Curated annotation (Swiss-Prot):
GO terms for cellular component: extracellular region. The presence of a 'disulfide through disulfide knot' structurally defines this protein as a knottin. Keywords: Antibiotic, Antimicrobial, Disulfide bond, Fungicide, Knottin, Plant defense, Secreted, Signal. It comes from Mesembryanthemum crystallinum. Belongs to the AMP family. It is found in: Secreted. Residues 1-26 form the signal peptide. It holds the Pfam family Antifungal_pept. This is Antimicrobial peptide 1. One of its GO terms (biological process) is defense response to fungus.
Length: 64
């Protein structure tokens, strides 16, 4: 019974680590509708596209 509990605990720890890493990675990008500048460095848009028209100082993130 102790082996089942320790392997379940290990699985839970790994699962928590993976979920927290994915949350950190996704937090490093700008969500759609938020302001962005494609000519500056990170963070970049999560969608990979910063819509900006001529004359605008900043654009906003959106899907293509």
């Amino acid at each position: 019974m102790a082996k089942v509990s320790s392997s379940l605990l290990k699985f839970a720890i790994v699962l928590i680590l993976v979920l927290s890493m994915s949350a950190i990675i996704s937090a490093k990008c700008i969500k759609n509708g938020k302001g962005c500048r494609e000519d500056q460095g990170p963070p970049f848009c999560c969608s990979g596209f910063c819509y900006r028209q001529v004359g605008w100082a900043r654009g906003y993130c959106k899907n293509r």
